[in-house]
């Protein structure tokens, strides 16, 4: 356990949070580069893309780590049985799915731009997959946290209480 939550909640939640911050920094940097320089020649053509990719990969890894830390033990009542006799917290499945959707959208975005040119706005289909996957991974982290509260001694407000303790 880390604090009052099981390790399969605390560790992946921290990794997902840090990874999303890295991806967000990359996204803001990428948008500013596109505003200044226009379309870049490929998916790995500017350094901001590496931050985005690293962040999205971290999100996917956090879901995989949550599954790996539970193994063959059923972690919560809402856990899902995997084909290899392992159990997965529902939140971990949501996080993995969101991370995978975002990572798949990255090369699709390059194909989209090669076919249709530069987007007029940020809200093209592949950008929605990228942003949506990252955003909904937060929902997966909340679900994972709620599952941990069910089996641990923590509360749903524990992260808020922790931050309040740091500020006070």
Please provide the spans of the model-predicted regions.
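Residues within membrane-spanning alpha-helices of integral membrane proteins
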Residues: 16, 20, 49, 53-56, ...
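Transmembrane alpha-helix boundary signature
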Residues: 32-35, 62-79, 107-117, 146-147
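Membrane-embedded alpha-helical transmembrane segments of multi-pass integral membrane proteins
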Residues: 22-29, 55, 62, 101, ...
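N-terminal regions that are enriched for targeting/export leaders
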Residues: 1-40
